[in-house]
Curated annotation (Swiss-Prot):
RNAP is composed of a core of 2 alpha, a beta and a beta' subunits. The core is associated with a delta subunit and one of several sigma factors. NCBIfam families: RNAP_delt_lowGC. Participates in both the initiation and recycling phases of transcription. In the presence of the delta subunit, RNAP displays an increased specificity of transcription, a decreased affinity for nucleic acids, and an increased efficiency of RNA synthesis because of enhanced recycling. Keywords: DNA-directed RNA polymerase, Nucleotidyltransferase, Transcription, Transferase. The keyword Transcription applies. Belongs to the RpoE family. This is Probable DNA-directed RNA polymerase subunit delta. GO terms for molecular function: DNA-directed RNA polymerase activity. PROSITE patterns: HTH_HARE.
């Protein structure tokens, strides 16, 4: 059965991935993802909001279903249309090859390594910018005097005594729970 013969009920019941397989088989040519979705919208009389969730699932299925092949530029076709050699040549991602450095290359003073030219450009960046705070000892001394005058400071010894007392109370509570 051709995809144009589908009724709205059939479109509602059938998965988009199966309809895409039928559509691509009928057309015998690669199609853009958005053209496939537009075809489904027109067949089912859908608005985009009506099928938004189905589109997400459809895209996931397209990528995972072995029957389909992304041939670039968001064009999709059926894997059956391509030989293994075609897939390896045209579709498989190319790997950029680099020369391997040997001992002679490492001794060559004119050889620039990756990233060396970027390091020189970073030299003009200031170590400190205007929006960063500076922590001078003189400022801290003024703050210490101000806090002492306000009687806000807790002596370090008092702080340790409080912490030890809390630990003992916690240990007593643990013994009680056992």
């Amino acid at each position: 059965m051709k995809i144009q013969d589908y009724t709205k009920e059939m479109v509602d019941e059938k998965s988009f991935i199966d309809m895409a397989y039928t559509l691509l088989n009928d057309k015998q040519t690669t199609m853009n993802l958005y053209d496939i979705i537009d075809e489904f919208k027109s067949l089912g009389g859908y608005e985009y909001e009506d099928i938004e969730n189905r589109i997400v699932q459809f895209y996931t299925d397209l990528n995972t279903d072995g029957r389909f092949l992304n041939v670039g530029e968001n064009l999709w076709g059926l894997r059956d249309w391509y030989s293994v050699d075609d897939i390896e040549e045209k579709i498989a991602p190319t790997i950029q090859k680099f020369d391997i450095l040997d001992d002679e290359d490492e001794e060559d003073q004119n050889l620039k390594l990756l990233g060396d030219d970027d390091a020189d450009e970073d030299d003009d960046i200031p170590a400190q910018t205007d929006d960063q705070e500076t922590l001078d000892e003189s400022d801290n001394d003024e703050d210490d005097v101000e806090m002492n005058e306000a009687d806000i400071v807790i002596d370090e010894d008092e702080d340790e005594d409080i912490a030890e007392g809390e630990e003992e109370a916690f240990e007593d509570a643990e013994d009680f729970n056992d």
